[in-house]
Design a protein with these regions (language model features):
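Charged, amphipathic alpha-helical segments and their flanking helix caps
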Residues: 1-41, 45-150
């Protein structure tokens, strides 16, 4: 199967179905939570990162490319103010221990290979309400077919 761009819906659906998080959302909701804080945790935000296409040629007016796409899952837990971080850190560890095998090696229908975990890092941006965050970066590959100028 071919996809013109990275499609996050099947990734979000897989994470939601596993029941690891109180909620799973996208970039717009992440900005709101960063400004206002959150009620309950853990919560996840699935966002696109980048795409790196490698064109493999044009045939019959169709550009073919192999694309390596990056996406991130940001996990937020709370509340650092209440417990000096112990509960929040435990939540991050527990959720990540289930998230990584959930995505690693799996691939949505449009992918030409499995999801691979690339790295993880602490989210250091301003988070309100005592939230602590962890960002896991993943890659997946897919084929892109785009009809060129008609």
């Amino acid at each position: 199967m071919s996809a013109p761009v990275l499609q996050l819906a099947p990734i979000i659906a897989r994470i939601e179905a596993a029941g690891l998080y109180r909620s799973v959302a996208g970039a717009r909701d992440m900005a709101r939570v960063a400004r206002e804080g959150a009620a309950g945790s853990p919560i996840a935000f699935v966002m696109p990162g980048s795409e790196e296409p490698r064109p493999s040629g044009v045939a019959g007016g169709v550009q073919h490319s192999a694309v390596t796409a990056r996406f991130m899952v940001i996990t937020l837990a709370e509340d650092l103010r209440r417990d000096a971080g112990g509960r929040a850190l435990s939540q991050l560890e527990e959720v990540r221990a289930q998230l990584l095998p959930l995505l690693e090696g799996w691939g949505p229908d449009y992918a030409s290979g499995p999801v691979a975990h690339q790295r993880g890092q602490l989210v250091t941006g301003p988070l309100r309400g005592g939230l602590i965050g962890w960002q896991d970066d993943f890659t997946l590959r897919f084929r892109r077919r785009i009809t060129t100028g008609a």
